[in-house]
Amino acid sequence: MKINQYVVELWHEPGMSPLSNAASRKMANHTHEVLPGLMEARGMKMIGAYHLDPEHRSILIFEAKCVEDVRDVLYEIGFMHWCDDRIFPTTPLPEMHKWAAAQEPI
């Protein structure tokens, strides 16, 4: 089965930051504890995780069979309690260029 890559952007308001909000900190700690097991159960792998300083934003990069696996993990680990998110399917730039070059221009 083909493994795809997905970029996830997560963000929250400053008042929801685990830095200052005790409930969010508890959720963040729980998230980091359970994430490896949830990913393993779906055959997923995290290949990147970055905080965008000084914003309240993070970028996660996953390898997964389908976008639904990524979505479900985000819900099950609790990110949706304190973060908003966007999930982006990705295409390697050389593949995108080849595809785009084959399209008829306007």
How does the language model describe each region?
Residues 43, 78-81:
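Glycine-centered loop/turn motif at secondary-structure junctions
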Residues 80-92:
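Conserved short beta-strand edge segments in small beta-sheet-based binding/regulatory domains
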Residues 1-56, 65-69, 94-106:
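Short S/T/G/P-rich N-terminal loop/turn motif that feeds into the first structured element of a domain
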Residues 70-78:
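Short amphipathic alpha-helices in soluble, non-transmembrane regions
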Residues 61-63:
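Short hydrophobic/aromatic beta-strand micro-patches
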